[in-house]
Regions:
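Short, glycine-/Ser/Thr-/acidic-enriched flexible segments
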Residues: 13-15, 56, 80-81, 109-110, ...
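C-terminal helical cap
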Residues: 185-193, 198-229, 260-311
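Short acidic, glycine/serine/threonine-rich loops at helix termini
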Residues: 12-14, 19-22, 60-62, 86-89, ...
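Hydrophobic, small-residue-rich alpha-helical packing segments that form membrane-like cores
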Residues: 1-65
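Alpha-helix capping and helix-loop boundary segments enriched in small/acidic/polar residues
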Residues: 21-32, 50-54, 80-84, 248-252, ...
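Hydrophobic residues within beta-strands of alpha/beta enzymes
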Residues: 8-9, 49, 105, 239, ...
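C-terminal cap of metal-dependent C-N hydrolases
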Residues: 147, 226, 230-237, 254-256, ...
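Polyanionic/metal-chelating signatures
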Residues: 1, 41-42, 57, 63-244
Length: 364
C-alpha cells in the first residue's frame, strides 16, 4: 500500500483453478491470513479490498470481515441466478447497510455467458472430475469423454453440488466444423429431436472434432432482465464484472458502460442518465479513494468521455487471432455514439480513431 497500490484483491471462487486443475493457492487461505492481509489495507487509511467469494470466504462473510479490517470491501459479484440466490444476497446486503457495514456488491447490466471450446470448458472445469483433465493431452481427454464411467462420475459430482451445475437449455452451438448445420441451435433442442441426453450429446459432438474444438456459448447468470433492473437500483451496490481482460477468448464485457447507457438508460429507462453516469464515475472513484477523479469541477483531473446519449451502443463483438501461438481474443472496439475521449485534459481519441501524438505524450 505504501508503494501506491489501490488495495488488495483475492479469490476463493470455484472457477479459479491453475493449469494443473488444482485450486489456486488463495482458495486454501486460512481466516487469520485473510484478515491480516485485508487489515493492512485498512491500516493504510485508504484503498479497497476486492473479494471473489467461495467456500472459505463467502459473500455473507464479507459483512463480518469488513468492520474488523477497516477498509471498504467490494465483492464479485451479485448477479441474478435461476435459483434466486441473488434475492437472499440482497437481503443480507440490506441488513449490512442498516448496520453501517461498508460492503459494496458488484452488479452488472451484462448477462454472464462464456463462449468456450471443449478444450477449455471454463464453467465445466469447476467440476473436480472435469478439472482432472486440465493438464491432460487431447488424446487423454478424448478417452475420458468417450468413457461412460467417466461421464457418470461427472453426473454424480453434479448431484452432490460439486462445481457449477450446467444450464443445458442455455447452451448454444457456436462453432462445429464437423456439424455446421447445428451452428446457432440450442443444445436441448437438438437433444429433444434426437432423444439424447444433453450432456452425452455435448460430448459426442465434441468427439466429432479431431481437436475437440466444438465451441458452445453457455449462460451462467444475470439473464433475468427484471432482476438485473432491481440490482442496478439497489442501494450500496457498484458496477463491476466487466472482466477487464480476463477470459479474453471466452467473453468480452468491456462494453458494460456503453450497454448501460444505451440499453438500460435510453431504451429500458431503468436508470436516469445522470444516475448511470454517477455510478460509472464518482461512485467508483470514491469507493477506491481516487481523489480529484470522477467529477467535473475546476482543479479535478480531466478524464472525460463525450458521447451522444441518443446513439451510444456497444457495437459488435468479434473474434480475432493475434496472440502468441495463434491465441484468440474477443474484442468490441466499434461502439457507436462515442465522440471524444480526454485523458488528463488531452484528447486521445476522436470518433473512434486514436490520436497517436497525444498518446505518445503519455497524458495519464
Amino acid at each position: 500500500m505504501e508503494a501506491g497500490a489501490a488495495g488488495f484483491a483475492t479469490s476463493f471462487a470455484v472457477t479459479h483453478r491453475g493449469a494443473d486443475g488444482k485450486p489456486i493457492p488463495s482458495r486454501w487461505a486460512a481466516a487469520d491470513e485473510i484478515e491480516a492481509l485485508c487489515k493492512a489495507v485498512g491500516d493504510s487509511g485508504r484503498g479497497v479490498i476486492g473479494v471473489n467469494g467461495g467456500e472459505n470466504l463467502s459473500f455473507a462473510d464479507c459483512y463480518e470481515l469488513q468492520p474488523k479490517v477497516g477498509a471498504p470491501i467490494t465483492y464479485t459479484a451479485l448477479l441474478t441466478t435461476s435459483q434466486g440466490t441473488h434475492l437472499a444476497a440482497v437481503e443480507v446486503h440490506k441488513e449490512g447497510l442498516r448496520q453501517g457495514v461498508d460492503v459494496w456488491p458488484q452488479v452488472s447490466c451484462r448477462p454472464l455467458s462464456f463462449s468456450m471450446t471443449m478444450v477449455e470448458p471454463f464453467t465445466l472445469n469447476t467440476s473436480p472430475i472435469f478439472a482432472e483433465l486440465m493438464p491432460k493431452s487431447i488424446e487423454e481427454r478424448r478417452e475420458a469423454f468417450t468413457s461412460h464411467e467417466w461421464r457418470n462420475r461427472v453426473r454424480v459430482g453434479w448431484e452432490n453440488k460439486q462445481g457449477l451445475i450446467p444450464r443445458w437449455d442455455s447452451y448454444e452451438i457456436m462453432d462445429a466444423p464437423s456439424s455446421p448445420e447445428l451452428v446457432g441451435r440450442r443444445l436441448t433442442d437438438i437433444a429433444n429431436e434426437t432423444g439424447a441426453d444433453p450432456f452425452d450429446l455435448l460430448l459426442e459432438l465434441a468427439l466429432l472434432e479431431p481437436d475437440l474444438k466444438l465451441r458452445v456459448k453457455a449462460m451462467l447468470a444475470n439473464d433475468d432482465a427484471d432482476g438485473v433492473a432491481m440490482l442496478l437500483n439497489t442501494e450500496g451496490c457498484t458496477l463491476g464484472l466487466s472482466d477487464a481482460g480476463a477470459h479474453v477468448g471466452q467473453l468480452c464485457d468491456a462494453v458494460l458502460s456503453t450497454d448501460l447507457l444505451g440499453s438500460w438508460v435510453r431504451d429500458k429507462k431503468v436508470l436516469t442518465l445522470e444516475n448511470a453516469v454517477h455510478k460509472l464515475t464518482q461512485v467508483q472513484a470514491d469507493l477506491f479513494g481516487f481523489t480529484d477523479r470522477g467529477v467535473l469541477r475546476v482543479g479535478a483531473i480531466a478524464d472525460i468521455v463525450v458521447f451522444d446519449a441518443e446513439t451510444i451502443a456497444p457495437g459488435p463483438v468479434r473474434r480475432v487471432v493475434d496472440f502468441p501461438a495463434n491465441g484468440e481474443r474477443l474484442t468490441a472496439d466499434q461502439p457507436t455514439g462515442m465522440h471524444h475521449l480526454f485523458v488528463n485534459g488531452i484528447e486521445v481519441q476522436r470518433d473512434g480513431k486514436l490520436l497517436q501524438p497525444a498518446l505518445d505524450s503519455l497524458p495519464g
